[in-house]
Amino acid sequence: MSPNGSDRSPRRPMRRKLLQALTAGLVLATATGCTYEDFPRLGMPTPTTEEAPRILSLWQGSWAAALATGVLVWGLILWSVFFHRRSRTKVEVPPQTRYNLPIEALYTMVPLVIVSVLFYFTARDESDLMSLNKKPDLTVNVVGFQWSWCFNHIEDVPGSTGDAKTSKELAGIPDRFIEDFPANAGGVYDCGTPGTENPQTGNPGPTLWLPKGKTVRFVLTSRDVIHSFWVVPFLMKQDVIPGHTNAFEVTPNKEGTFLGKCAELCGVDHSRMLFNVKVVSPERYEQHLQDLAKKGQTGYVPAGIAQTSHEKNRETNNL
């Protein structure tokens, strides 16, 4: 026991525990199978669209702010626990500090600044990501149903007849989207069967083909319940709501086949509501549309539940 009455426990066990914790963290980091190139993405897949890096940057910034705040809070907690765990005097209750205005102001302003900065960058990026071009390179009507997907390619494909602007199958889509459809777009479609595999890829669900370097507008409609259209490497997903039409645009910039899934619990086979996105060259994409037309998959499948009167009143004419 020291002369001042303090009876501190040795620090060696604490150092041993700290070493064990660091070793466990190192093992956990290496056991994930991630390379050093994966760690900066903080669990996100490699972006495959021109818009995805912006989402990744927002994700990384949010984690950086959270970790900085956590380190500060954890540091203060650990400092208090280790260095003030026992009084060095015989006084059982140390002097209490109350009504410290500078500290209270700091506790109020720091969280307010953090939240305000995160709100600004989130609002800025969301506004840009959700903006729509007047004339996208191509439009795909994504139709969700229990428990698979249909894709209406709204294109003027040789061998197809009709017009997307007057098609009764697409009548449920709001006029503000129909007005941007190409003229005389007879279109082709592709549909999946719940729980089956795509014969071309061996992966579950249908395959949506997209051209590299072209801006694609997804117009999302549902036939039954709420779904969510999520292409994982696009870092973008949007709800598919019956009676309401959502839309967003992306520009794929990497060829390959990528996983897509429904991200909204939609019933007993929700986990099997998968699909694939195959990004190819524009020439291969055009050939694929012609192949669908040769198979007889011309025209469009029903888009789903029409926009309700309430939603039509809420809609504006501005994209």
UniProtKB/Swiss-Prot annotation:
Membrane topology value: Multi-pass membrane protein
Species of origin: Streptomyces coelicolor (strain ATCC BAA-471 / A3(2) / M145)
EC number: 7.1.1.9
Enzyme type, top EC level: translocase
Domain of life: Bacteria
UniProtKB keywords: Cell membrane, Copper, Electron transport, Membrane, Metal-binding, Respiratory chain, Signal, Translocase, Transmembrane, Transmembrane helix, Transport
Binding site residues for Cu cation: H227, C262, C266, H270
Co-factor note (free text): Binds a copper A center.
Entry GO MF terms: copper ion binding; cytochrome-c oxidase activity
Signal sequence extent: 1-33
The protein, known as: Probable cytochrome c oxidase subunit 2
Family: Belongs to the cytochrome c oxidase subunit 2 family.
One Gene Ontology cellular component annotation held by this UniProt entry: plasma membrane
Function: Subunits I and II form the functional core of the enzyme complex. Electrons originating in cytochrome c are transferred via heme a and Cu(A) to the binuclear center formed by heme a3 and Cu(B).
Catalysed reactions, as listed in the record: 4 Fe(II)-[cytochrome c] + O2 + 8 H(+)(in) = 4 Fe(III)-[cytochrome c] + 2 H2O + 4 H(+)(out)
Sequence intervals crossing the membrane: 63-83, 101-121
Localization terms from the record: Cell membrane
Originating gene: ctaC
NCBIfam families: CoxB
GO BP: ATP synthesis coupled electron transport
Cofactors required: Cu cation; heme
